[in-house]
Amino acid sequence: MARGGFPNMGGANMNNLMKQAQKLQQDMEKMQGEMEKKEFSATVGGGAVTAVANGKKQIVDIKIEPEVVDEDDIEMLEDLIMSACNEALKKAEEDTSSEVKRLTGGMNLPGMF
C-alpha cells in the first residue's frame, strides 16, 4: 500500500466514496427529522377505532367511538385497538423503508431504522 492508502484504489476514488458516505449520512439525518413530523393513521371496525402513529413508530393518538364501548365485550374493543395500532405502525414502517430505499438506491444497510 502506497502512502497508507488502499491497494488498487486511487485517492480520488476514496475521496469520492467518503463524500458520498457523508452526503448519505446528511440525507438520512434530514429524513429522520422529516419522518418524526409525519403521522400515519389507520381506522378499523367501520370507523370505530382510529390509531395514529408518528414516523418514529410511536402511537400518538387513539380515537374510540363511544358506541363501540361495551362493558360486556371488552375483548372486541381490545382487538380493534390492537388492529388499528398495528396497521398505523405498519404504514409508518412501510413509509420509512421506502424513504431509506430511495436514499440508498436500494442498498441494504442494516440498522439504519
Curated annotation (Swiss-Prot):
Query: What Gene3D superfamilies does the record point to?
Result: Nucleoid-associated protein YbaB-like domain
Indicate where this protein is primarily found.
Answer: cytoplasm
The question of whether Cytoplasm is a record keyword is answered with yes
Q: Domain of life here?
A: Bacteria
GO CC terms, sorted: bacterial nucleoid; cytosol
Q: Protein transport as a keyword?
A: no
Which keywords, in A-to-Z order, does the entry hold?
Cytoplasm, DNA-binding
**Cell location:** Cytoplasm, Nucleoid
Annotated region (Disordered) at 93-113
The UniProt GO MF terms for this protein read: DNA binding
UniProt cross-references to Pfam families, sorted A to Z: YbaB_DNA_bd (PF02575)
Question: Which intervals carry biased composition (Basic and acidic residues)?
Answer: 93-102
What is this protein for, i.e. what is its function? Answer: Binds to DNA and alters its conformation. May be involved in regulation of gene expression, nucleoid organization and DNA protection.
Which family is annotated? Belongs to the YbaB/EbfC family.
Q: How does it assemble?
A: Homodimer.
Report the protein name in the record. Nucleoid-associated protein CBO0032/CLC_0052
Source organism of this protein record = Clostridium botulinum (strain Hall / ATCC 3502 / NCTC 13319 / Type A)
Provide the taxonomic classification. Answer: Bacteria, Bacillati, Bacillota, Clostridia, Eubacteriales
